[in-house]
Amino acid sequence: FIGLYFFNKGSQSKHKSSTEAIFSNDLEDIFKFLIQNGEEAIELARVDTLWRISGNDTLEVKSRSMDNLFDKVLKVNRGTIISENPEKYGKYSVDDSTGTHLAVIDSKGETVGYYVFGRSKSDYSRSYIRVGNDPNVYLADQNVTYMLSTRETYWGEKQKVEIPPLPSIPTDTSAVTN
């Protein structure tokens, strides 16, 4: 009976789910993001303190979209291993053609994080993730795939131009005759 208890306890500990943040490097050292989904891709690059959409000088990057990238996407936790079989990547939408790829690049031009996100078809509040060269597919603790759009208009908006108020025109009512 005691042997069965320890055997059962040992087999249960193998299936425990631990969570781990996907990105642990210094956020201040990130200078570029590359996001790709299928044939569509976008590059976001930091110039001094401002983020820019590479190849687009008419849109100003939305701070809310960048905040989501730093505060939500990079802070996603990977949990339970869903699959250890690369042949099942398509099932979890984390293969080359259906996954959303995110590369995080530092000031030296080195890739410090590479992730492939896939939507969960059964639980819309979560997503699947592959991390770097790790062949495992993990369940992420939240769904952030919608924050990884390749559309320029998701990341940027037309620059707001301040239009000065028109000078007031004095109205002289003394010239009005009844």
Language-model-detected regions and their locations in the chain:
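Secondary-structure "cap/kink" motif recognition
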Residues: 1-178
